[in-house]
Amino acid sequence: MNWKKELGNLLETKNWQEALDLMANVVKSDDTSVDAYINYLYILEAIPLEPEVDYLGEMARRANDALFGVYEEARSKYSDNPDFLFWSGWLATWCEWLFKIDLRDAELLMLKAYVMCPENKLFELAMVSNRKYTRDEAYEDCIREIMSDKDTVNYIEKRGPVGEYMLYLFRPHCQNGVS
């Protein structure tokens, strides 16, 4: 079983410790995988936000303590990689303080990815995202365009659990998009 599938299974069963251990081992054994770092950041950020996890407890503390170090390690390797820039920026817009950056810096990471790869439909989201958490028509149209493009949906799915989560968030915005 590949690590993305294994991670998905662990997250589905809410086996947080094994998920953390898996990703620590994956980035240790394959530290050239952007997707590994992106998914590791995703679970490090998501675990403390899970309703079943005591946000003051040991598991949340361990995830919070590890997140910035993992982010810094990945950033030192991938600061010019558009995939890393977009996905880490997207993740950081949820809880930018955990990444020790401000919201504008998180948005700029996404924007830099778009400038580097303007043909990537997903990265266009950086141009229309309204980070005041109100969604305007341009944002909705962009999500519908993303979801109606099979290549873009496939690109998102291939990222692993972080991509599946993005698609989960996007699906309610679409009535006729790819699901």
Describe each region flagged by the PLM:
Residues 2-18:
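Alpha-helical segment of the N-proximal tetratricopeptide repeat
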Residues 20-26, 54-77, 101-114, 137-153:
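Alpha-helical repeat scaffolds
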Residues 178-179:
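Extreme N-terminal leader/anchor segments
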Residues 12, 83-86, 151:
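Acidic, low-complexity intrinsically disordered regions
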Residues 11-16, 63, 80, 119:
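Helix-boundary capping/turn motifs
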Residues 1-5, 30-54, 79-96, 119-134, ...:
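Amphipathic alpha-helical repeat scaffolds of TPR domains
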